[in-house]
């Protein structure tokens, strides 16, 4: 597939760990954090509109982001594969610690755990699309890729928030057809800098250590609240937040990072990745 070798070399420099996705579905990764928006306010606030414009600006020069620029000491926690049975506890922990996060939603999970998305919205967290059924997109025809993205996006919008502008490909797998679908839906692909590999359940301490050791200015950290037993990730979350702040990092959402400290225009532009 066109550009696979060049892309893999480029992504090795920006995506650590090579993982990224629940083990069940994929083969594949401040002194004070910014406080999330007031409950229920994000979708209509001036801040939301500024962040949406920032996403549009970034889309003007790249279809993906795997980190912000290194200028600011900011990191973004991203949480995938939910909502799930522990999502409410993730939300409560983040709110208690005034820690922003970006949740990437699997559409079919809303059948059983829609209350989790409602809590994320009320807390003012950023919301992205993670496909309808956590499909490996490179195994789908182009039209089915677009449908997998759109079906989840429409479900998310039905909860009273705007159509999502951010998308994370399950397992990090994408190809030229994925990028074409994202252009159609005006979405930015969000990869990651630090893969905690929490889906392998290595223990809360190991998850925390990977998140903190891998953090650099502009890092996007990959965690999961769904797709399996996420008790270890939940247990690690407070220590991750405290230790990142002790190292002088400010926690932000992905849209906030794109507004404050967007990636360089010289970052590699992916053509395809995966099978």
Where are these regions (language model features)?
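Active-site beta->alpha N-cap acidic-glycine motif
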Residues: 46-158, 259
